[in-house]
Amino acid sequence: MSIFNKVTKTFQWGQNTVTMETGEIARQASGAVLLDMDGTVVLATVVAKTEGKAGQDFFPLTVDYLEKTYAAGKIPGSFFKREGRPSEFETLTSRLIDRPIRPLFPEGFFNEVHVVVHTLSLNPEVDADIAALIAVSAALSVSGIPFSGPIGAARVGYINGEYVLNPGQTARKDSVMDLVVAGTEAAVLMVESEAQQLSEEIMLGAVVFGHEQGNIAINAIHELVRDAGKPVWDWKAPAKDEPLIAKVGALAAHKLEAAYQIRNKQARTRACREAYAVVMADLKLDGVAFDSVAVEGMLFDIEAKIVRSQILAGEPRIDGRDTRTVRPIEIRNSVLPRTHGSALFTRGETQALVVTTLGTERDAQRIDALSGDYEDRFMLHYNMPPFATGETGRVGTPKRREIGHGRLAKRALMAVLPSKEEFPYTMRVVSEITESNGSSSMASVCGGCLSLMDAGVPMKAHVAGIAMGLIKEENRFAVLTDILGDEDHLGDMDFKVAGTTNGITALQMDIKIQGITKEIMQVALAQAKEARMHILGKMQEAMAEAKTEVSTFAPRLFTMKINPDKIRDVIGKGGSVIRALTEETGTQINIDEDGTITIASADPAKAEEAKRRIQQITAEVEIGKIYEGPITKILDFGALVNLLPGKDGLLHISQIAHERVEKVTDYLSEGQIVKVKVMETDEKGRIKLSMKVLLDRPGQGGPEHV
């Protein structure tokens, strides 16, 4: 009899067969599920503490997605030969899992929860992120932890006008969309996508299609829970202190209402802090025993109620706008004198200084991914220091949020970048957020597009981004255009859309409540399009098209094509030839397998010299042509003459002079420059030369023949 109480569920999901197991591996975790999706195997575990920490007012959920190189039959390339800090993909996948599960834990549940996912085996054609989402949903569902799941998730492609469920790596090359959707049976909770300028209707259709397909996984998880689920925790939210809530409300309501009439963010924040301090002081004066953390939570609830009720009543928003108006926009290009491209994009109290740097192919990021190595010639890095929100704090390595925002902005711009053939540069865009009051990632999209155009990158179109919000109470709702930071915190949805005049290039949606309908999403998309067109108009006014020339401080790239068989000649033994070329000409030279050579130099003259020398190296020796070159070696029967770099010919002793030559050294010496004519090449490719045909015969007026 086995010591394991293993339960297995298998279901067909599109073209994939999925098997979920629990009860054999990681039995001491609160919940653990091993999921196999056609050779991609992930282990999802969840552990929750049985008690919350005293005085804690937030939900401490941590999600760690970890890839093991053995999953793809690899050994880590680092010095220590073991996995190190999380890769960007691991960080992004951790966020992808966190976003749809976080809203499903009950309000007031502050017990620490740790979700860990290990990728144990990888089929390159089956994405581990989707497998991980399903496995985490199953592990949480069987654990008994308070959780309003399960969730389903699916990747959606769009190929030849049709939606495709969970397309693999190969199929995605033909897809004009890469969309991931996650949600419960009833509602969509999270969307992450990039697209090739597609319409709102196609994008919304993909969300609906993906949500429907995710329900197949939800049904299978229900079956697993029925057979293997642990008892549901007997957890109840702490009872609310109604008398204290009423007391705080009486003391704070008017003060906070007055604070939210202030349009300036910094002044409003100060007024709210002062209101908090006054309420705490009044409670102490009244002799009320209270927990300051709990009172702060009550005050936040009052703030939320004020802001939400004002918006639903049709009153002006926090900064005085209506629901559809975009904040004032200011744009300045070429802000920094010696960078390759720069733009300062300001929208209200959100500002991004975005800088583009152009490099050679050698500057491309080499990524050692589990599914295979590749190079990325476009990078976008997002930084938001504490001063952007008027706060103090630590500055250092990028946090998960910064990595996620950078990735979203990158996705938005990728669809309109020129191909490598059109523009062979490596591009790095850095967005420095210098002010933030909502939607800084979308400011990075707008500023990034303008910065690239300022650098001379021939973009296919302008790209703008906008963040939408939602306030919903029962059947009443309001969609907000260009949300502020406070509206993001106090609202029910963060919906970011980026695109061109032709269509959407990136879409990200995070919903904090259930009950968002297709109709609400349609309204949000239509309102976002209206705002996007407005911003695109402002951007086109500021910069109608990309500069026709790259910056004088950027490297100039010159391309040429050689016979691929000649690549070894240009590189030389141990890289000696190309190393000498780069050092002597002061250029960077990159050679592709197809024989395309890219020469990079800020000085066109140096690039031309490198090109001339490469042409020399790769040139073929022509029969009948006269060459001038040094003697590289004296032999008993002749001499070797260098005709072209790396190409020597034999000058036989009989071809040195018309008279009989007894000793080669009587006529020639090493290093001597001589003129020779190529007479023939033998079957082994050896080159035969003659000097005497270029010399006058004794007693005659000219050479034999030239």
From Swiss-Prot:
Residue stretches making up the KH domain: 555-614
Enzyme Commission code: 2.7.7.8
Q: Which cofactor names does the annotation list?
A: Mg(2+)
- Asked whether the UniProt record includes Transferase among its keywords, one would answer yes
Gene3D superfamilies cross-referenced by the UniProt entry: GHMP Kinase, N-terminal domain, K Homology domain, type 1, Nucleic acid-binding proteins
- What would be one Gene Ontology cellular-component term for the protein? cytosol
What InterPro entries does this protein map onto? ExoRNase_PH_dom1, ExoRNase_PH_dom2, ExoRNase_PH_dom2_sf, KH_dom, KH_dom_type_1, KH_dom_type_1_sf, NA-bd_OB-fold, PNPase
Tell me the CDD domains matching this sequence. Answer: KH-I_PNPase, RNase_PH_PNPase_1, RNase_PH_PNPase_2, S1_PNPase
**Which keywords appear in this protein's UniProt record, sorted alphabetically?**
Cytoplasm, Magnesium, Metal-binding, Nucleotidyltransferase, RNA-binding, Transferase
**Catalytic activity, as annotated:** RNA(n+1) + phosphate = RNA(n) + a ribonucleoside 5'-diphosphate
| Keyword check for Cytoplasm | yes
**Binding of Mg(2+), residues:** 488, 494
Enzyme class, top EC level, equals transferase
Q: Which family does it belong to?
A: Belongs to the polyribonucleotide nucleotidyltransferase family.
The protein's name: Polyribonucleotide nucleotidyltransferase
Q: Which gene encodes it?
A: pnp
